Amino acid sequence: MPKSLEIYKGSCNWEESGLLGSCFSQGLALLPRVEWSGAILAHCIVDLPSSSDPPTSASHFSGLQAHTTTARWSLTLLPRLECSGTISAHYNLRLLGSSNSPVSASQVAETTEACHHTRLIFVFSVETGFHHVGQAGLKLLTSGDPPASASQSAGITGVSHSARPKSCFLQLLG
């Protein structure tokens, strides 16, 4: 049976079925760890903090063979795959300043654990100062191959205007 978790503004932490995450200052970091055949679907809508708030960071998480640099007004999904599965992540972000650069797949995630014939897809949109919708496809290799990252193999396409974000919905399918 699918497990669902819906998170609104505020501070929270959870750990369930190998899924680690944290909500902080209206920002969000998701760190799913998939160790079975199946799929994980994350749909995150986040109202991000103002410029007076400190940068959000996912760097304090440990125990995952993944790395990210999460700066202010960013949303991070760091998957670790240990068997066949699919991860789909949809981001709707509202940035509160026009001086910020667009979020790119290379800033969002880098994977060091790999599975045969697994696809990692990031879809995200950003508004205020610029309008951008991107989709990055990443085909993960076998463990004998060098680590793959979104910055090495992803293409960013499309332009759109996103809705005002406010909540996060996470559904785990097994």
UniProtKB/Swiss-Prot annotation:
It comes from the Eukaryota. This is Putative uncharacterized protein encoded by LINC00269.
